[in-house]
Design a protein with these regions (language model features):
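DUTPase catalytic domain/fold
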Residues: 1-147
């Protein structure tokens, strides 16, 4: 497992810094920096009170927490949310209540998402007239079966 150093800034001194729940987890828990109630199918931009400086060649991916998704229907609208290395603004999460009938209460300090930081290559695109053939070809969207 490789390690990188990421600078993080508390925009609110009361905010808890993200951490891994377990040493081998991929995602750092992000917490809400505000109280809110989401009605069924309502979405909201939620503050975390944090800003980060990712190293060049890395990106952050904000993803839902599986327990909140299955138990309450809380998800993230633009899953995964992308944080580019040159972004220095506040980390915010666009959450949505997918439960058809129940409100979801979010308290300041609740874990609402996970931040996964990954190395990302810079890609050089080369335009060609034809692509190489594969067994799959242009089959997609269920072409390999559903069971």
């Amino acid at each position: 497992m490789s390690n990188i150093t990421v600078n993080i800034k508390r925009l609110d001194p009361t905010v808890e810094l993200p951490k891994y729940a377990h040493p081998t987890d991929a995602g750092l828990d992000l917490r809400s920096n505000e109280d809110c109630v989401l009605k069924p199918f309502e979405r909201r931009l939620v503050s975390t009170g944090l800003a980060i400086a990712l190293p060049d060649g890395y990106a952050g991916f904000v993803q839902p927490r599986s327990g909140l998704a299955i138990k309450q229907g809380l998800s993230i609208v633009n899953t995964p949310g992308l944080i580019d290395a040159h972004y220095r603004g506040e980390l915010k999460v666009i959450i949505i209540n997918l439960d058809p009938s129940n409100n979801i209460k979010i308290n300041k300090g609740d874990r609402i998402a996970q931040l996964v930081i990954k190395e990302v290559p810079t890609v050089n695109l080369i335009e060609v007239e034809e692509l190489d053939e594969t067994d799959r070809g242009n089959g997609g969207f269920g072409s390999s079966g559903v069971a």
